[in-house]
A protein has these predicted regions:
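Terminal targeting signals and extreme-terminal segments of soluble enzymes
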Residues: 1-132
Length: 132
């Protein structure tokens, strides 16, 4: 599994994802996963905190990777993503996302995530992925 996750993560670091830094991902058990990333300067908004689009991107990618694994390594696409921003992420802070696969059907995966910074929750997210 570690090899499969690494290869898939290497693939997700192409294109747009090259711009946000090194997102790591690991499987905890069958329904729990974790992702992490350091907030880089190019991921800040004009107020000097992590841009909401950056937070949404890491949530979508972390939960999407979990959907891919939950779906038996089939491709999945996001059909719904809900983000709630709770506190600010700061420059060089490490963010850790805790992912839970809530339910999987033949064609859909339902997932939630909490994103933590240093001793605080930064955002929560939930979404639905279509299995292709």
């Amino acid at each position: 599994l570690r090899f499969m996750v690494k290869n898939y993560m290497d693939e997700t670091k192409k294109g747009f994802m090259q711009n946000i830094g090194d997102l790591s991902f690991k499987k905890i058990d069958e329904s729990n996963f974790e992702y992490s990333i350091k907030i880089l300067e190019n991921c800040l908004n004009t107020g000097g905190i992590a841009h909401g689009g950056f937070i949404a991107t890491i949530a979508d990618t972390g939960m999407g990777n979990a959907a891919h694994i939950a779906a038996g390594n089939k491709r999945c696409v996001t059909i719904n993503l809900d983000i709630k921003f709770i506190s600010a992420g700061k420059l060089n802070e490490k963010l850790v996302g805790k992912v839970k696969v809530l339910k999987k059907t033949k064609s859909l995966v339902f997932i939630s995530s909490e994103i933590f910074g240093a001793e605080k929750i930064v955002a929560t997210a939930s979404g639905t992925w279509k299995i292709l």
